[in-house]
């Protein structure tokens, strides 16, 4: 019946809204772990808690996503400039094909950490972070707090530059 469908939709909407609140600025990050290119599970926590990393960008993307690939030059510029100063990227691909995922990483010289369950949007990280569209990202500080969300273009470079100057 229509009432049941509406109820199900409302329940999903409510759950998504509650999950989104858990990933607001000021909230602690939610740990995730996915396989890297070698098939080894890499947890976000291990990257955030690494003393060398002052800020970690949790970046959700896919090779088929035009806007995601449009962000790559900005990510590369920021990573190349600040990785030795404490900036790391934990890239989570929403690709469903391993070859597409790893091919995009290689072709675009995306030389930071990449993980993927190779399940598209049907992956645990998408649920944990209430991801409904990509590109999407979360900037996490060394204490594990989300300090910014969805930094695009020059905004990412400017924010990291500002934070690392403090």
Predicted regions and their residues:
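Alpha/beta-hydrolase fold active-site loops
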Residues: 52-56, 135
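Thiol/disulfide oxidoreductase modules built on the thioredoxin-like
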Residues: 110, 117-165
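Hydrophobic beta-strand anchors of alpha/beta hydrolase catalytic cores
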Residues: 57-58, 89
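Oxidative protein folding and maturation machinery
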Residues: 1-42
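Conserved redox-active cysteine motifs that mediate thiol-disulfide chemistry
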Residues: 60-77
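Short amphipathic alpha-helix with an adjacent loop that forms part of the alpha/beta core around
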Residues: 44-51, 126-129
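Long, His/Glu/Asp-enriched segments that create or flank divalent metal/ion-associated functional microenvironments
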Residues: 37, 71, 94-99, 103-107
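Thiol-based oxidoreductase modules, predominantly thioredoxin-like and allied folds used
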Residues: 85-100, 110-121
């Amino acid at each position: 019946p229509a009432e049941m469908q509406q109820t199900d939709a409302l329940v999903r909407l409510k759950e998504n809204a509650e999950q989104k609140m858990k990933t607001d600025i000021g909230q602690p990050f939610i740990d995730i772990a996915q396989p890297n290119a070698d098939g080894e599970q890499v947890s976000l926590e291990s990257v955030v808690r690494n003393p060398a990393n002052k800020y970690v960008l949790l970046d959700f993307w896919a090779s088929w996503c035009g806007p995601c690939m449009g962000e790559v030059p900005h990510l590369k510029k920021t990573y190349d400039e600040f990785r030795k100063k404490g900036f790391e990227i934990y890239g989570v691909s929403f690709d469903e094909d391993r070859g597409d995922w790893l091919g995009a990483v290689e072709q675009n010289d995306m030389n930071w950490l990449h993980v993927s369950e190779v399940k598209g949007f049907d992956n645990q990280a998408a649920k944990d972070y209430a991801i409904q569209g990509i590109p999407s990202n979360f900037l996490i500080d060394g204490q594990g707090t989300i300090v910014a969300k969805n930094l695009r273009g020059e905004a990412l470079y400017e924010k990291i530059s500002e934070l690392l100057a403090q």
